[in-house]
């Protein structure tokens, strides 16, 4: 598991805020993907039993992963934050902190509190900046729990007095992090994203969101995949502001660079669902990026 976390750290080390010529300070940020923190007691099992595939994932996967790997994984995260050099200035989490699917409003509140209790237990001593994931708002009462439990905790952990939504910015050192919520019904969300990026004097700019901007596997999952106009606008904003995309959702590790008419976009996609701490070498490595994703996996229909 140490090696798994080292991979995440090494990805960010290459993006450290420093320049020897300008004698700037070296800093690091620890990047986490989906976690899907899950305790069986946080589910209405009668409700969940009506959804066989969700029941399987909860009982056979995420609750098991949480029990078997989260205690050690969280200790490693805490240790890296304390000892890693250059020093880690923040932990960045790309959404799906919890599994969701609690089954009732009461259980949704309970699940949200359990997830943040797990984060608090790490006692990180640095900002914990997170974005909204689809599982964080899935199930009866989940959206209300996000408003009531998630947003106050997100504000506290990131060092903000309060948050009205999952669209917010945090600046640390010379680095800007803009959390973007594509599910927000605010029609001016993209304009606000552009304003946040353009209005910052930070040298390094990151856009944090759960779903990838650039699809990287045969499922072709990416934000705004059913809204070409918004997708083009998002690509233009990110590329023109030379921002780097940080995302998750696919439970994969990926680094890609895509050319657009407005410039290149670099995207880093990570995963923190640890199924087996003893798997230290990737089983499948894809070095070429192109349309062969679709033809190589005909069983998948791109969405």
Task: Give the ranges of each region predicted by the language model.
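N-terminal active-site segment of His-dependent metallophosphoesterases
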Residues: 18-106
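Positively charged n-region of N-terminal signal peptides that target proteins for export
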Residues: 1-4
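Short acidic, glycine-rich surface-loop motifs adjacent to enzyme active sites
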Residues: 200-218
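Short, solvent-exposed loop/turn elements at domain surfaces
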Residues: 27-29, 37-44, 186-189, 216, ...
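Bacterial N-terminal signal peptides
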Residues: 6-14
């Amino acid at each position: 598991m140490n090696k798994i976390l080292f991979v995440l750290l090494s990805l960010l080390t290459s993006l450290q805020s420093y320049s020897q010529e300008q004698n700037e300070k070296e800093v690091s940020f620890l990047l986490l993907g989906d976690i899907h923190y899950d305790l069986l007691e946080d589910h209405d099992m009668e409700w969940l039993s009506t959804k066989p595939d969700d029941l399987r994932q909860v009982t056979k996967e995420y609750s098991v992963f949480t029990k078997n790997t989260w205690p050690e994984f969280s200790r490693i995260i805490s240790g890296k934050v304390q000892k890693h050099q250059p020093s880690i200035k923040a932990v960045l989490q790309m959404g799906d902190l919890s599994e969701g699917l609690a089954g009732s409003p009461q259980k949704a509140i309970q699940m949200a509190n359990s997830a943040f209790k797990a984060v608090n237990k790490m006692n990180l001593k640095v900002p914990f900046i997170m974005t909204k994931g689809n599982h964080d708002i899935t199930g009866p009462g989940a959206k209300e729990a996000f408003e009531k439990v998630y947003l106050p905790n997100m504000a506290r952990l990131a060092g903000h007095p309060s948050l009205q939504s999952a669209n917010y910015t945090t600046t640390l050192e010379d680095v800007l992090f803009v959390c973007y919520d594509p599910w927000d019904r605010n029609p001016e969300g993209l304009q606000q994203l552009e304003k946040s990026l353009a209005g910052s004097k930070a040298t390094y700019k990151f856009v944090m969101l759960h779903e990838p901007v650039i699809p990287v596997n045969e499922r072709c999952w990416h934000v705004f995949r059913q809204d070409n106009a918004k997708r083009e606008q998002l690509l233009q904003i990110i590329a023109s502001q030379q921002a780097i995309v940080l995302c998750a959702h696919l439970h994969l590790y990926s680094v890609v660079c895509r050319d657009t008419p407005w410039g290149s976009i670099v995207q880093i996609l990570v995963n923190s669902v640890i199924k087996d701490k003893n798997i230290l070498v990737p089983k499948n490595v894809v070095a070429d990026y192109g349309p062969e994703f679709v033809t190589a996996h005909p069983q998948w229909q791109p969405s």
